[in-house]
Amino acid sequence: MRIIAGNWRGRPLIAPKGTETRPTADRTREALFSMLVSRLGTLDGLRVLDLFAGSGALGLEALSRGAGHCTFVEQDSAALDALRTNIAKLGAAPQCDVRAQSVMALGPAIAPYDLLLLDPPYRSGAGVVALERCLRLGWLASGALVTVETA
């Protein structure tokens, strides 16, 4: 697993130990971000919210491509270890906020986000619930884009 493009292109990422998470494949991330850049023109300066963040591959890819900030939300301890290691290895800490909590425990937003990256556990229904929660609690800016990975 690696960063596909941008400032950290080719830099390796570690995956969480165990079988609780399944990182988004490089090819899938490449296709997703190609679509996002095609739609937006650039990710420069965007505020990104990466829910069910796992290793952080999606949010870190956004930062590598110019996003200004990413908040990662993850509750699994192995995934958090991998996420924090990946952030440190890239020197990305100033642009990151890591929240070690359940996505379902998010309170009202302090400021809205421009891009929501949702990669919930497959067949859990958590993606729909998380999106509804983000909308209700003001996490999404007007015109924000949302991506959801499902099985």
Regions found by a protein language model. Give the residues of each.
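Class I S-adenosyl-L-methionine-dependent methyltransferase catalytic core
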Residues: 1-151
